[in-house]
C-alpha cells in the first residue's frame, strides 16, 4: 500500500514526534508499504522506511529542492524523487498516489492537506483511510474543533467517522492491518 504522510516542515519541539515518525516509517518498511512524502518531520518517516529497507516516493516542488529536498541518495532505487511545479501540484500528486493518509504533528500545511483529504471524503471523492496521529495530544484542539463542527451542523458525524485517530505508530499499524 502507498501511504501518504503529512506532517510539519520542522521537527517540532517534542522529541516524541520524531521518534513516532521514525517508528511509523520502520513499520511501513517491515509491512512492505511505500511511503509518499515531502520533507521536514517526514524526513524522520523516510529515514525509518529507508533504514529498514523500504521504498519511498518523495514529491517536492522545484522551488524547495535547495532548502528542503529529500535525501540526495537514491538508496539503490528505493527512493524515487518526483519534482513538481508547485505546492498545489504536489498536494494533488500525493493525493493521487496515496492509498491511505496519515497526518503526523505539523503546522498549517499539514492542516491544509488533511483538511483537503477530509473534504474530499465528505463528497466520496476519497474512499481511503484517513488517520490523524495525535502524538502527545498535539491534535486535541483540532479534534475538538471537528466535534464542534458536527454539533454546530457544519460537518456530519458520518464524515467525522471517516477520520481515525491514533496516538502512536503501533496504533496506526493496528488501524491499517
List the predicted regions and their residue ranges.
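A cross-family phosphate/adenosyl-ligand binding-site feature
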Residues: 1-97, 135-177
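Short, acidic/small-residue loops that bind anionic groups at enzyme active sites
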Residues: 104, 118-143, 157-159
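Active-site/ligand-binding-proximal alpha/beta "capping" segment
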Residues: 89-123, 131
Amino acid at each position: 500500500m502507498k501511504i501518504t504522510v503529512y506532517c510539519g516542515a520542522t521537527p517540532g519541539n517534542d522529541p516524541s514526534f520524531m521518534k513516532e515518525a521514525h517508528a511509523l516509517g520502520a513499520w511501513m518498511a517491515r509491512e512492505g508499504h511505500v511511503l509518499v512524502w515531502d520533507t521536514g518531520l517526514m524526513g524522520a518517516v523516510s529515514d525509518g522506511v529507508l533504514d529498514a529497507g523500504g521504498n519511498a516516493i518523495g514529491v517536492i516542488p522545484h522551488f524547495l529542492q535547495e532548502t528542503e529536498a529529500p535525501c540526495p541518495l537514491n538508496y539503490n532505487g528505493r527512493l524515487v524523487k518526483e519534482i513538481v511545479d508547485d505546492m498545489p501540484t504536489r498536494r494533488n500528486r500525493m493525493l493521487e498516489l496515496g492509498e491511505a493518509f496519515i497526518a503526523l504533528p505539523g503546522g498549517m500545511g499539514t492542516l491544509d492537506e488533511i483538511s483537503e483529504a477530509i473534504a474530499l471524503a465528505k463528497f466520496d471523492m476519497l474512499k481511503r483511510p484517513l488517520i490523524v496521529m495525535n502524538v502527545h495530544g498535539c491534535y486535541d484542539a483540532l479534534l475538538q474543533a471537528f466535534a464542534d463542527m458536527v454539533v454546530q451542523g457544519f460537518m456530519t458525524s458520518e464524515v467525522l467517522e471517516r477520520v481515525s485517530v491514533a496516538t502512536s505508530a503501533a496504533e496506526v499499524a493496528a488501524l491499517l492491518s
